[in-house]
Amino acid sequence: MPSVQIRSSPSHSQPAMTVTDLKQRVIACLNRLSDRDTLALAAAELDSIALNLSPETFSLFINCLQSTDSSAKSPVRKHCVSLLSVLSRSHGDSLAPHLSKMVSTVLRRLRDPDSSVRAACVAASVDMTTNITGQPFSILFGPMIETVIHDCDPNAQISAAMCLAAAVDAADEPDVEQLQKALPKIGKLLKSEGFKAKAELLGAIGTVIGAVGGRNSEKAVLDWLLPNVSEFLSSDDWRARKAAAEAMARVAMVEEELAPLYKKTCLGILESRRFDKVKLVRETMNRTLGLWKQLEGDSTEVSESSSSSKSASSGLSATSGKRSNTLKGKDRNLNTPLSSKSNDVEPLDRGDTPKDVEQEAVVSKEKRNRSTLGAKRVLFPAKMHKVKENGSNKSQVVQSSDEESPKTDSGSSSSSQAKSNAEELSLIRHQITQIEKQQSSLLDLFQKFMESSHNGMQSLERRVRGLETSFSVISTDLLVSRSITQNGNHKRNACRQN
């Protein structure tokens, strides 16, 4: 019986000892993270502990991570958040009862000034969203929205907006109603001077628009959203310009019914900003511009096609008017030249009179004067050649046809001039693009040169410090050896004197 009691008593006390040992082990590993020499071993041990936890020890482990002081070193703060990702990936929905505590642990690190800690918060938000699906999405989404809206710390604003965008983008089935309610709230922050993380907020807005996916969208939301977002296309911050272009691209992709209503305005804005000086922004602008051009219902294209059809129809009516006088034109500008043509041609059929000859001379003189124009030579070279070679009757007929359609000639010359202007603009744009590519390559080379020179300076400084250290050690050794030899000499001299 005593042996049974001895065996049974440790079995009852084993779980308590295991929990105590686990807590001490975790705290010891967290302390070892502060030392650069033991950082890798401590991180590996903590990852192993997180992988092998039981559901009874989840709360204890998360409490140890949450109790880490903000004054700890950056590797400690970063790895505490990274362990939440390890837990989420390895245990999944078993952590659903502890999700709110994990979210609060992430929220405590949003104010961290270290960007690596904020990046770990974003990764943890994604892992919790994708792997812990047993709880509503609002447990993670709600606190992030509140932090974005109410927190005045710039680091917290940046981190919360990034976590919000990453979580919404990673969620399989986000709560669309909550996203629609939150969109006007976070959209108002674009006009707030107290909110500094405008680029990250624009990214979050674009992600929310993509998650809603055009479901139950309201025109009133886009009426204020698109103008506010498009204002940041001319921002001084290139990240804000890029995020604004991405948000407008999301609108073009998901809002198939409402986006065409804003196509003309958005195309004009994007066309004016497509030649950005930053390569990433320029590429994003061009992609967004292509998406908006693919939308249907552009009033600009309709007006252009209608105007071109009108000009073509006017040209056809003028040509038919030359061949037949039976056409009843609808344009008043074409009726007058047709009547003048009939009046000029009838006397020629009956016989030339002196008055008609004078009119013919005046007409042919005007024709010769107008033939010297550059636009006329370019547009109608064959006709002018025929007029010069043929007789006076042919020149009269050509002159009457020219008088029939002065607007057709001017329209043709203006269209030719517009075409040449378009070709010149395309050539200028091509040259500007080449110059921008050369500038970007030069900037890349300059950055690489600066990085290499910086690395060289750092290595040189390390070598100089090493030389100084070795020199100080050598000088110290020399002083010690000299003092020893001097003391030995004094002792020898004293012994000799005695």
From Swiss-Prot:
Residues 343-366 have a biased composition (Basic and acidic residues). InterPro entries: ARM-like, ARM-type_fold, TORTIFOLIA1/SINE1-2. Keywords: Phosphoprotein, Repeat. GO terms for molecular function: microtubule binding. It comes from the Eukaryota. SUPFAM superfamilies: ARM repeat. The modification Phosphoserine is found at S426. Residues 390-400 have a biased composition (Polar residues). HEAT repeats lie at residues 56-93, 97-134, 136-173, 177-214, 219-257. Residues 300-322 have a biased composition (Low complexity). GO terms for cellular component: microtubule. Residues 296-423 are annotated as: Disordered. This is TORTIFOLIA1-like protein 5. The gene is TOR1L5.
